[in-house]
């Protein structure tokens, strides 16, 4: 009778982590940045039907890189959690921190379970506050850990290189146009350092805008508004975007 093949727990977990990281790295990168009036989500996404960014609740947004079917299940679960908690208690009781804890428990349980493969996803949960100091951004890797981020964060693809680029250039108080242009510049850098062009139609952009009078702060930026933000300069573009939003 042959001896059963033994794999140490440490090696098994390392193999699962490597498997998940490789799956996430195959996806396209996305970035989340704070700007003066909120938080902006930017990613390269040629599909108009499958979104990387979504609204979870009034002030909370969701971003994900990796396998679409896996993070879509997590997104739907997050929406249900937020709706139930807001209905049972109060809308103010729905927070990004609470949602991040729920996602962390789910991802951690799946990652440590030998009965199923780990999720090939990396999540970002963001909440816009009344002031920039109240903004919250949490990154959740495949193993269910929670990383509290400030300023900017990148996930998927060559996230490490993009994060380094953003850390050197991102500043507090940037306008939406400035933050968007910085995000596109970061996403346009290939692993060898060369710059490529990403057309506007391949970009997915959304914001959590604290200045919106509506209770729900999440808004997608598309079409002419996106073109103006990419082409024009800060103050003029911000005024045009605000006026366009009021007209909608």
Swiss-Prot record:
Q: Which GO terms describe its cellular component?
A: cytoplasm; proteasome core complex, alpha-subunit complex
Which superkingdom is the protein from? Bacteria
Entry keywords, A to Z: Cytoplasm, Proteasome
Q: Which pathway is recorded for this entry?
A: Protein degradation; proteasomal Pup-dependent pathway
According to the UniProt entry, how is activity regulated?
Answer: The formation of the proteasomal ATPase ARC-20S proteasome complex, likely via the docking of the C-termini of ARC into the intersubunit pockets in the alpha-rings, may trigger opening of the gate for substrate entry. Interconversion between the open-gate and close-gate conformations leads to a dynamic regulation of the 20S proteasome proteolysis activity.
Q: Which PROSITE patterns match?
A: PROTEASOME_ALPHA_2 (PS51475)
Tell me the GO molecular function terms. Answer: threonine-type endopeptidase activity
Where are the stretches annotated Disordered?
A: 229-248
State whether it acts alone or in a complex, and with which partners, per the record.
The 20S proteasome core is composed of 14 alpha and 14 beta subunits that assemble into four stacked heptameric rings, resulting in a barrel-shaped structure. The two inner rings, each composed of seven catalytic beta subunits, are sandwiched by two outer rings, each composed of seven alpha subunits. The catalytic chamber with the active sites is on the inside of the barrel. Has a gated structure, the ends of the cylinder being occluded by the N-termini of the alpha-subunits. Is capped by the proteasome-associated ATPase, ARC.
Q: According to its UniProt record, which protein family does this protein belong to?
A: Belongs to the peptidase T1A family.
UniProt-recorded name of the protein: Proteasome subunit alpha
Gene coding for it:
prcA
